[in-house]
Amino acid sequence: MRFIFLIFLIFPYASVIAEENNYGPVKEKINQSKINWLLDRHNLQEARGGTTSGLEPNIDTEPSDYFLKIIDSNSKKEKDRFAILAMSGDHKANFEFTEIFGSNPNYELDNPYKSWGTETIIVIQNSENFISLQHILVMFMKDNDGNIQGPYVQKHWRQDWSYEDKNILEFQGKNKWAVKKQKNIKKSWSQAVYQVDDSPRYESYGTWVHEEGVSRWVSESTNRPLPRREHSVRNDYDLMKGVNKISVLPWGWVMEENNDKIKTPNKYVGTEYGLARYQKVKNYDFNAAHEYWNSTKDYWNTVRDKWDKTLSSNTKFCLKKLHDNNPLFIFHFSQAEEFKKDKDILAAKNNIDRTIKKFISYECNIR
């Protein structure tokens, strides 16, 4: 049986991301005025994304300890915290993104995107008003002879949750970022999403609502740069404006995205709907993820510290996409591998400072 998963060029116990064309080419667009069903159109249009034969994990349908704590707690804030912590643990993650309509009557809908991976989500910070969750992919794959290869490890994205966050980092388009003051933050939590290299991606805030069987969080509308699956194949827009809805359930959690595609400054192009489903799994070997994290976490802690200082002392900045024809993550992943060998935190800090300095500008006059 074939499965679709999130393609990365990954090596055992290493972290190097895929070339962008591995996200799949645009193959056949469809005129939206000529079809009846938008979300389920596999009979009309092939999905893009990487494909391989993988080791299917066992789905765990039992509620997690944190989900049970949501039920048992009488404190609203504690319920919020347990809902966030319930996103941690071992999961099979399925990602689906589908364009559903465009502004032009004859807008050609892009190929749907589908991928999957197995990833563990580690709680790396946990205090009363702040929780940080690090996602790490671990894949076992079947070769042409049916033999299992792996594990293949990839440091993935990170999400930070802050209670009553007064400062929200907002993407402005054109590689620009700005810190915005927020006023109506009572009992709210912000979710800040970071790239695989711990550089910022987007941030928004919302309020958790707890009901029998589910805890939900819905964000305010959020500007964000194009994800890799899009900027490698699209040049007709340069900003997403999205709303996220997170549902924490007994068997895992789901993040829905409703994303408008914008050509800055204000031209609307189209809208996509996205669904990331995280199902809890059991009896799957994630030891390689924990080994990688334990051997590199001091390096990544230093990267986060550098970004924390940058964001706390600057209200605006810009990020270059490339330096010496390489993106930021290439430098960081290479340096993390060096740190695994020599454990020289001072050298790592100097490398991190120099590297981020090459990519960041406070004058915002970069392309």
Residue ranges and their predicted role:
Residues 85-90, 123-129, 246-253, 280-284:
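A short, structured loop/turn motif at beta-sheet edges
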Residues 18-86, 99-104, 109-112, 130-132, ...:
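Amphipathic/hydrophobic helical signal segments and adjacent flexible N-terminal regions
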Residues 125-171, 177:
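Extended amphipathic alpha-helical segments with heptad-repeat/coiled-coil character used for oligomerization
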Residues 109-111, 115-125, 134, 241-248, ...:
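Hydrophobic/aromatic beta-strand elements that line small-molecule binding cavities or substrate pockets
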Residues 3-12:
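Sec-dependent N-terminal signal peptides
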Residues 93-95, 132-135, 191, 196, ...:
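Short hydrophobic/aromatic-rich beta-strand segments that constitute the beta-sheet cores
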Residues 180-241:
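Short helix-loop boundary/capping segments
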Residues 218-270:
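Extended serine/threonine-enriched, polar tracts that run as long, contiguous segments within proteins
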